[in-house]
Amino acid sequence: MYNLNNEYKDFIKDNIVDSSKNYYSMIFPGIPDSGRKIHVSCTLKNYNNILDIVSRYCVKNRISFKVIKDINKYFANGHKNGDRSSYGKFITIYPKNEDDFIRHIENLYFNLYDYEGPFILSDLRYKDCKCLYYRYGSNIINRTYDSKGNICRLIEYNGISYIDKPRPYFYLPDFIKNPIEQNENISKSSNLLFKYKIDEVLKFSPIGGVYKAIQKYTNLKCVVKEFYPHTAIVNEKIDSLFLYTKEVSNLKKLKEFKFIPNIIEHFKDWQNYYIIEEYISGDSLDNYVSKNNSIILESDYKKSIKYIYDAVNILIKVTENIISLYEKGYIFTDLAPDNIIINKNNVYFVDLESVFMLNDNKDALNYTINFFNCTNSNEDNIKLVITNLLLYCFNKKSKVYDKFTPRQILSPIIRRCYQVDNILDLINEINDSETSIFRIKLLFEDYSKKIFSAVSSGEYNEPNLEPTKKEIFQVKSTMISSVGYEYDILENKNSLAYGTLGQFLALNYIFDYKHSKDTFLNYIKDYRSNSFFYGYSGLLYVLDLNEIGSNDIVEKILGNIDYTDKSLSTGISGIGISLLYNYLAKKNANTLKVLREISLTLKENEELDNSLETGRLGVSLFYIYYYYIFKDTEALSLAEKIINQVILDYKDNGYKKIISNQLKDNHYEYYLSNGICGLLSVLVEFTIKTKQTKYTDNIIEFTKLCFGIYSLSSSYFHGNAGFLYTFFRMQKNINISKKLEKNILNQINNFYLDITNTIINDEVYDISLQGNRKNFLGGKEGVYTILDMVNRNDDSKNIFPFII
C-alpha cells in the first residue's frame, strides 16, 4: 500500500477495497453507469504526493476512485511492449454527474497544476495541467457480451447505444458533447509537420512512434523517431528523455561507422522529442527471414541451400559490425532481429539507444530476451547474440532459446534439410571456450566457401528421404489437469475452444472419461454467447458427448440465434453443427426447424473469407454434415459450390498471408484455422461423408504444397498439431500412391517430432512461452489429443470441430 500522509489516511486504509488484481478502490454511492471519468497520471518522483492529494480530495468530497495496485506494473506498462491505450492511468475518478465533473476537475487542476505525468493517449488533457486528463466512458460491468463471451462496455447516452472500446487515441462520438471547450490535447507547435511529411507508421509503442517521412524542402527520405515524456521509466534519472539523449549521443559518436544511419537533426516539439535520421531501405532481419526462409516455405531443395548460404553471409556482415563496435570500445545490448536492416549487400544497425561503452554502467539497459544476458561478460554476450541471430535465421522461436539446446531448436529444420546440421557444428565452434570473438567471422567465411564449393560441384543433392523414426510420446492423465470453471466477469476463460471447457473434452477423447453434470453446473449458469467455439453451443456438444441432459441448453440456444454471423467459430455454421450433433440423439422438432433456417441463411455467404474458422469452409462443413444426416442433395450441392469456389480462388490468388505489416510480399498460409490444411481437412471430411472421390486430385495437389511446412507453434488450430491431424486423416482415408504415402508418412513423423521436441516436464512450449496454456485449439489439451490419436493409429474419434 502507498504511504499516505493526509487526515483521511486511516479511513482510506480501513475502507479501501481490493477490487481486482490491478486496482484498489474507494467506493461511494452514486457512480453513474457511464459518464465523464477523470484520470491522473504520475511519475516515479511524484506518485505518492499525487495520490495523497487526490485521495484526500476524493474522500472529503465523497467521490469514488480507484488507484493502480502495483506502481511497478504501472511503470512497466510504459515500456516498448506496454499497452498504449491504458498507460498513464494511475488514478481514475468517477464524478456523479456532469456538473460534479466540471467542478471537481477544476478544483483538482489547482491542486495538481505543478505536477507532471505521462500523456494519456485515450484522453483529453485538462487545460495545461500535465497530469490531469478526462474522457467519457463506461463505469460499470453491465453483462453485455460479444460473440466470444467477453464483456462489452456498453454505453447508453440519450437512447443511443455504443460500445466503449479501449483505444490509444481520444474518441468521442458526435452525439456526446464535450462540456469543456478549451483543452491542451493538441500541440501548440507544429515544427515537425512544418518540416516533414509523414508517409507511413513503422511502429508504435507507449514510448512513441517511429515513422517513415520525407523532408519537405529536400525530398529526402528519413525516419522520424518520437519520444513521449515520462515513459520507459526505470528510475528517477532514467526514462524516455534519457533514451532520447542517449540515442542522439550514440548517433553522433558512431557516425564513423558506415553501418549506422546518419542523424539529420533532433529537436523538441511541444512536449515530445524527435530524432530525424537517414532512412535505410531494406528489410529487417526479422522480415528477411519471414520472406526468404525457403526451407519451411518451399519444397525446392536448391532454394533451401541458397538460403543457408545467404544467411551465413548476412551473419558475416553482422559479426563484422559487432566486432568493429567492440574494437572501438562499444557494445550494442539490443541487437535483436528487428534492429538489423538488410540492404542489398550491406547490413545496418538501427535503434541505437542501447549502445554502451564496454565498461559503462548499463542501468538503462534495453534488450530483447535471449539476445543479451546481464550476467554475461561482453565477449560472452557477443557470442550469445551471434549464435541466436544465426538460430533465428532458421527457427524464429527466440523466446524459448533459453529452454532448449541449439540442436533441439534446429532439429525440425534439419529434418527438412539435412545440411542445416552443419550449422550446429558452426554454433559449437563459435561457443567453444577457446574461440576468440575475433575468429568468429573467419568461421563464417570458411563455412560460406564450403557451401559455395559444394553447390558448384553438385555435392549437395536433394536426399531421398526415408520416414523419420520417432519415439512414442505417451500421454498420461496427469498431464491434463481439469482445473474447471474460472470466474472472470470481463474475460471468457471457460470456452470450449480456448478456455477451461476444452480440458474436459481432451479427457473425453484421450481417456474416454465420462463427466457428471455437477462438473458443468457453473458453465451452465454462465450464459454469455451461443457460439460453438466460445459459448453454449460448445457446452451443448460436451454435455451430449458425456450423455448429460441438455434440453434447457438447447432451448436457450434456439431462442437466441443471431443469423447475421455465419462463421464456424462464433456464428450459425458452428451453432448448426452442434445442433446437428444434438439432433442425431434427441430428434427435437424445434431443433430441426432451426437447422432448416440455418441452412437457408447460409446460402448467401459471398461476404465471408475462405478460411475454416471464420469463413466459407466453415459453412461448407455445416452443409457436408447436413447432407450426411438428412441426405439432402441441395446441401451437398451447396457444399460443393463453396469448395469449388475456394479451390478456384486458391488457383487464382492462393491463400495469402502478410507475415509482417512491413512486408509487401505474400506467402501461403497453411494452418487448420485459416489455410491450406483447413481446406484439406474439409475435402477429407467431404470424401468420408459422401463416399465420393471427386476431390482426390485436389487433395494430392494441396498436400504436396504442404511438404516441408513447419510452425513456431505446436497448437492444433494454429500450428503443428493441426498439420499432424490433417496429414494423419488424409493418410487414413484417401486412396493415394505408395510413393506419395511414403512421403506423407515422413511428414507425419516430422510433425509428431516437431511437437514432442517442444515438451518439457509435460508442458508444451511454443513461441508464446506459455507452457501451461490449457485450452483445446491453442494449448496443450488439443496437442495431446492429436498425439494420442496418432499413437493409437486410429482416427475413428471425431475431434472438435469435426464432430460428426
Regions found by a protein language model. Give the residues of each.
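Short beta-strand micro-motifs within the conserved protein kinase catalytic domain, predominantly
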Residues: 262-273
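Juxta-kinase regulatory segment immediately upstream of eukaryotic protein kinase catalytic domains
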Residues: 148-200
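Structural motif at the C-terminus of the N-lobe alphaC helix and the adjacent alphaC-beta4 loop
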Residues: 249-259
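Terminal, non-catalytic domain-edge segments
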Residues: 115, 438, 442-485, 685, ...
